[in-house]
Amino acid sequence: MVVSREEVREIIGRGNAIVIYEDHLLNLNGWLERHPGGEKAIHHMIGRDASDEMNAYHDPETVKTFKRWSIGRVKLPWDNLVPPIQGGNYSFDKVDQRVIYKKLGIFPGVKIEPKVQENIVLTEKSASKLLPVGGVRDPKTIIEDFDNKLVYEDIKQIPSLDHETQRNLSLQYNELHQTIINRGYYQCDYWQYFKEFCRISSLFLLFVLFLRSKWYTLSAISIGLMWQQLVFIAHDAGHISITHNYQIDNIIGIIIANFIGGLSLGWWKRNHNVHHLVTNDPVHDPDIQHLPFFAVSSRLLGNVFSTYYEKYLWFDKIAQKMLQIQHKLYYPILSFGRFNLYRLSWSHLIMGLGPRKGKAAWFRYLELIGLCFFSYWFFYKTMSYIPTKTLRFWFLLISHWTTMIVHVQIVLSHFAMSTSDLGSTESFVSRQLRTTMDVDCPEWFDFFHGGLQFQAIHHLFPRLPRHNFRKVQPLVIEFCKNTGLHYSIYGFVDGNGKVVNKMADVASQVVILNDCLHSIHLENTTGKNLYEAKVESVSIKG
């Protein structure tokens, strides 16, 4: 049975989680609670052709099971609907609000507005009409004004967003993916993990040796570096890219993340899966939602409702003060990042936000045991070995400050990149390359970055073992040359410079917005509103 686009809209409107895979209409109502990747990952794909995403994130055996959820066929090519969680327009008059929230991710009393409405294809010409810039006096429009300029710049730098061009990009991406599979790049090089084991074991031995020798600063640095390196293996395990066995890789990840590192692998996976699907979207991607401390998009300056955290991110007085100097506070705040991860990890497990049913459900209890074990061996046993409260305090700070390195590495790949919503026509491959950068470094130094230097490649092929990223890089570069997509790569210093500059740009918008709010009624000697005059003097940095 072939189902039309409007019929699909009606089926979703009856409270069904409908996703398009190839030419099949999948009803995932019965899978939401069991999906190991979390229900929100599915919510963001409702009404869309998710073929590229589903093939990229799942192993071949899992891919074979997709069509068992099929309830019909659709005619290809499919024009994406906007998912309900992203503000799609559906009629839910006869559906219970609890069903809508559970199955579709819609929040009662909250209205999400997509930047680009359904059936709109952004072009340079249409963007100037749909996303006007300039001549504003209302302080609320400063957010849209700044963001619209960035959207316009993005449109000029990528291939056309029309359906045919984006479908061709998808086809070429799938050809590239098949080439990578055929060349055996999904085979994990376990010799590289033996090297990782030796390196991390050495850091652990140094931690113990220095601790017993009462060289507490060196001991703290050693364990901090060990945690930094362990994060990369936990990341690999979370993507099932070590053994490609779901249970084994998750157990490896939990031992490393929870038992040794004190962080929840389940929390990270739930967060990270959404991040991969809606990368750098200010409303939906939790990886760039850090108010009141950071904002990398002016869209976060307007009390945005986070569909991930299910709450408003308030642009309150604290945020208004902090964001004006965020580029100056960037590194100091990142140095305390691990403490926030402890909070998020415990909250995730205590509140039971991970899968409650299916093969991933039991991980919650193993993770809780892991966090308790970590608290015992680090916060109790290790700290009790240090004689004074002052030394314990500094040991705690130095060990956690050392892990700031990995926080810088994580955000480097995305903070400086596009945060624009270009509409539902943009393909998976276009979005990933537009919102992600790689970091240039010599091959011998790859271990230090742990694969995070190839985040653009990782976002295209999430299950690919990281030790093969460098082998795949020439293929991705050639692909980008052939398609007109841009492969962004910068040195570590230059990349950090772009991040800080991006944050300074947004900080300048906060200053302007605050000036507007305080002086909207005052006029300067030219008769212009002070806010309007200042807007004219500010230009967006490239």
Curated annotation (Swiss-Prot):
Residues annotated as binding heme: 35, 58
Superkingdom of origin organism: Eukaryota
Location of the motif Histidine box-2: 272-276
Entries under Pfam families matching the protein: Cyt-b5, FA_desaturase
A GO molecular function held by the record: oxidoreductase activity, acting on paired donors, with oxidation of a pair of donors resulting in the reduction of molecular oxygen to two molecules of water
Annotated motif Histidine box-3, positions: 455-459
GO cellular component, one term: membrane
Subcellular location: Membrane
Membrane topology reported for the UniProt record: Multi-pass membrane protein
GO terms of biological process kind: sphingolipid metabolic process
Location of the Cytochrome b5 heme-binding domain: 1-75
Transmembrane regions: 215-235, 248-268, 329-346, 360-380, 393-413
Keyword list, A-Z: Electron transport, Heme, Iron, Lipid metabolism, Membrane, Metal-binding, Oxidoreductase, Sphingolipid metabolism, Transmembrane, Transmembrane helix, Transport
Motif Histidine box-1: chain residues: 235-239
Coiled-coil region(s): none
Protein EC: 1.14.19.18
Pathway assigned in UniProt: Lipid metabolism; sphingolipid metabolism
Alphabetized InterPro entries for the sequence: Cyt_B5-like_heme/steroid-bd, Cyt_B5-like_heme/steroid_sf, FA_desaturase_dom, Fatty_acid_desaturase
PANTHER family referenced in this protein's UniProt entry, alphabetically: DELTA 8-(E)-SPHINGOLIPID DESATURASE, FATTY ACID DESATURASE 2
Family, similarity comment: Belongs to the fatty acid desaturase type 1 family.
Its job: Delta(8)-fatty-acid desaturase which introduces a double bond at the 8-position in the long-chain base (LCB) of ceramides. Required for the formation of the di-unsaturated sphingoid base (E,E)-sphinga-4,8-dienine during glucosylceramide (GluCer) biosynthesis.
UniProt-recorded name of the protein: Delta 8-(E)-sphingolipid desaturase
Lineage summary: Eukaryota, Fungi, Dikarya, Ascomycota, Saccharomycotina
